[in-house]
């Protein structure tokens, strides 16, 4: 394997300082390129509530997979998988080293191991496709399959309505990926050496206090106005993944007079604490990972320096 075919993972719970540390690493090692592994940073306009790096840092450090979709769109794990593989290949091809940083643990897992199964069947979507889109006609259903997935349409007979419907359903459930493409992702393990680091709290109570302090800072920085502006875009459904994010969901309920201001703050902090516990549970079970405590971040920079020296 080519010596340069390796990359870094930097994982950790929310608010622990992953992004700022990643930017510091990028400053010290220009050879490194940053890729975000965060299911919310992909959305444009979700800035304050996601603690997104500022415009200057995003531009100067070429942070990948940030601000790539509109909040009215649904960005799935399959979208991420497809996008991140392209970014990794492009970075390695340019002779640089990818550093993937974030807290969306499912994304990291899928990237490492590929997909184990197709998206689960959804009876509501199946009925809607057949009744409303195809008007209960198998010819219309098959023509739709030919349009969205011509490869699968050549392998499935028009009279096999269940298989045709399943192939069409997969396209819609996956966020626009043909069945013939998804199959390629099955158990498709990442073909590069990965050095994995987990940034963990030295003191969880300190992290929880940091979360509270950060959210109050977000409120002072105009978070309410940010959510109000998003909500004023009438095409934005509160149930969309973008608007269902922690903080945005609670602020929307406050703006709709379903929460008091105090309830909004309390529920946001409570949900963030729950997310942190979930992320730390993932990390505890994560194989082949080097843990770095958040009060010893310089140790990570030293380790990366040694790895770069050994492998370049």
UniProtKB/Swiss-Prot annotation:
<dbReference type="InterPro" id="IPR018022">
    <property type="entry name" value="IPT"/>
</dbReference>
<dbReference type="InterPro" id="IPR027417">
    <property type="entry name" value="P-loop_NTPase"/>
</dbReference>
<keyword id="KW-0460">Magnesium</keyword>
<feature type="site" description="Interaction with substrate tRNA">
    <location>
        <position position="126"/>
    </location>
</feature>
<feature type="binding site">
    <location>
        <begin position="12"/>
        <end position="19"/>
    </location>
    <ligand>
        <name>ATP</name>
    </ligand>
</feature>
<keyword id="KW-0547">Nucleotide-binding</keyword>
<feature type="binding site">
    <location>
        <begin position="14"/>
        <end position="19"/>
    </location>
    <ligand>
        <name>substrate</name>
    </ligand>
</feature>
<feature type="site" description="Interaction with substrate tRNA">
    <location>
        <position position="104"/>
    </location>
</feature>
<comment type="function">
    <text>Catalyzes the transfer of a dimethylallyl group onto the adenine at position 37 in tRNAs that read codons beginning with uridine, leading to the formation of N6-(dimethylallyl)adenosine (i(6)A).</text>
</comment>
<dbReference type="GO" id="GO:0006400">
    <property type="term" value="P:tRNA modification"/>
</dbReference>
<comment type="subunit">
    <text>Monomer.</text>
</comment>
<keyword id="KW-0808">Transferase</keyword>
<dbReference type="Pfam" id="PF01715">
    <property type="entry name" value="IPPT"/>
</dbReference>
<dbReference type="GO" id="GO:0052381">
    <property type="term" value="F:tRNA dimethylallyltransferase activity"/>
</dbReference>
<protein>
    <recommendedName>
        <fullName>tRNA dimethylallyltransferase</fullName>
        <ecNumber>2.5.1.75</ecNumber>
    </recommendedName>
</protein>
<feature type="region of interest" description="Interaction with substrate tRNA">
    <location>
        <begin position="38"/>
        <end position="41"/>
    </location>
</feature>
<keyword id="KW-0067">ATP-binding</keyword>
<comment type="similarity">
    <text>Belongs to the IPP transferase family.</text>
</comment>
<keyword id="KW-0819">tRNA processing</keyword>
<dbReference type="GO" id="GO:0005524">
    <property type="term" value="F:ATP binding"/>
</dbReference>
<feature type="region of interest" description="Interaction with substrate tRNA">
    <location>
        <begin position="162"/>
        <end position="166"/>
    </location>
</feature>
<dbReference type="InterPro" id="IPR039657">
    <property type="entry name" value="Dimethylallyltransferase"/>
</dbReference>
């Amino acid at each position: 394997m080519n010596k340069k075919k390796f990359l870094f993972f930097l994982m950790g719970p929310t608010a622990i300082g992953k992004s700022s540390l990643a930017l510091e690493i990028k400053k010290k090692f220009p050879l490194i390129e940053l890729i975000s592994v965060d299911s919310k940073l992909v959305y444009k306009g979700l800035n304050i509530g996601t603690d997104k790096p500022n415009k200057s840092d995003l531009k100067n450090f070429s942070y990948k997979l940030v601000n790539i979709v509109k909040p009215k769109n649904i960005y799935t794990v399959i979208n991420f998988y497809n996008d991140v593989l392209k970014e990794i290949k492009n970075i390695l091809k340019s002779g640089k080293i990818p550093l993937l940083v974030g807290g969306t643990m499912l994304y990291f897992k899928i990237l490492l191991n590929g997909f184990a199964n197709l998206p689960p069947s959804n009876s509501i979507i199946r009925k809607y496709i057949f009744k409303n889109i195809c008007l209960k006609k198998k010819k219309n259903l098959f023509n739709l399959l030919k349009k969205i997935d011509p490869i699968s349409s050549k392998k499935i007979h028009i009279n096999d309505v269940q298989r045709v419907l399943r192939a069409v359903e997969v396209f819609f459930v996956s966020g626009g990926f043909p069945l013939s493409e998804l199959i390629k992702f099955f158990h498709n393990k990442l073909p590069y050496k990965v050095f994995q680091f987990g940034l963990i709290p030295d003191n969880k109570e300190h992290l929880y206090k940091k979360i509270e302090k950060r959210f109050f800072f977000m409120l002072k920085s105009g978070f309410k106005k940010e959510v109000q502006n998003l909500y004023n875009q009438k095409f934005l459904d509160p149930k969309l993944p973008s608007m269902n994010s922690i903080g945005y969901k609670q602020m929307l309920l406050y703006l709709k007079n379903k929460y008091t201001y105090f309830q909004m703050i309390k529920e946001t902090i409570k949900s963030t604490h729950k997310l942190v516990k979930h992320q730390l549970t993932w990390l505890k079970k994560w194989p082949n990972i080097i843990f770095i405590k958040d009060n010893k971040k310089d140790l990570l920079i030293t380790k990366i320096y040694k790895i770069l020296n050994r492998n370049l």
